[in-house]
């Protein structure tokens, strides 16, 4: 059975690309036609590419790999958080802080600080500190939670990235490429597919399209995790 159907893709509007004047010629091979000044993505190719990405993600999870979901545009924020939490993987849905991957030791210090502040809140330390100091600490904690909460438990670099709109997330893409971390991405008609290891040609601006494709990658992770559990049972 196919991982995803043409009907699902059509209903979610995955086939709608950008205006013809805003395009990357490298995406030509994934474009079916042009309609009313908008490029229409070839969904037969999308079906095939979703399957390739799904298989990669499933096998990665089966090997115990972890994925970092990245989507900071408004249309992606909720799906990225939901699906990462559903699968127990990581996410960044606010702003990509430069050096998140390439300067990971510094990022780890910030997530350690977040953990420390949460501990202080939970163990009653805040209750005995001066009110003004607590206000400052809470502000710091909220800011760290906002930008780094989704990677608070990421103690090593991720094994792959799932990116929504690699053009917007170009810093994340550049960092992953520099470190040789594979990238799976929803790539619209205005993006450069050559920077992506597993291209999913599709609409990165419609909430339904983003939700469908992000959920599909999350399903692949869950299926892969089941395989890991089965292997562990067999070994035991």
UniProtKB/Swiss-Prot annotation:
InterPro entries given in the database record: Ribosomal_uS2, Ribosomal_uS2_bac/mit/plastid, Ribosomal_uS2_CS, Ribosomal_uS2_flav_dom_sf
UniProt xrefs under CDD domains: RPS2
Keyword set includes Plastid: no
Sorted UniProt keywords: Ribonucleoprotein, Ribosomal protein
Keyword Ribonucleoprotein: yes
Pfam families: Ribosomal_S2
Single annotated GO MF: structural constituent of ribosome
A single GO BP: translation
Stated family: Belongs to the universal ribosomal protein uS2 family.
Protein name as annotated: Small ribosomal subunit protein uS2
Protein source organism: Brevibacillus brevis (strain 47 / JCM 6285 / NBRC 100599)
């Amino acid at each position: 059975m196919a991982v995803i159907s043409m009907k699902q893709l059509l209903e979610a509007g995955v086939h709608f690309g950008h205006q013809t004047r805003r395009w990357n010629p490298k995406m030509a091979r994934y474009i079916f036609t042009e309609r009313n000044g908008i490029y229409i993505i070839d969904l037969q190719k999308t079906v095939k590419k979703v399957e390739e990405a799904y298989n990669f993600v499933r096998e990665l999870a089966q090997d115990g790999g972890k994925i970092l979901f990245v989507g900071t545009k408004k249309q992606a924020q909720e799906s990225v958080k939901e699906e990462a939490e559903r699968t127990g993987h990581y996410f960044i849905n606010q702003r990509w802080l430069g050096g998140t991957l390439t300067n990971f030791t510094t990022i780890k210090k910030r997530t350690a600080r977040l953990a420390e502040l949460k501990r202080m809140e939970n163990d009653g330390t805040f209750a005995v500190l001066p009110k003004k100091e607590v206000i400052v600490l809470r502000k710091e904690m909220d800011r760290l939670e906002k930008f780094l909460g989704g990677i608070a438990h990421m103690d090593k670099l991720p094994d792959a990235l799932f990116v929504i709109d690699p053009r917007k997330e170009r810093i994340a893409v550049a960092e992953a490429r520099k470190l040789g971390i594979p990238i799976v991405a929803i790539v619209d008609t205005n993006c450069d597919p050559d920077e992506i290891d597993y291209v999913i040609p599709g609409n990165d601006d419609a909430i339904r399209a983003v939700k469908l494709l992000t959920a599909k990658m999350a399903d692949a992770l869950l299926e892969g995790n089941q395989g890991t559990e089965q292997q562990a049972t067999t070994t035991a």
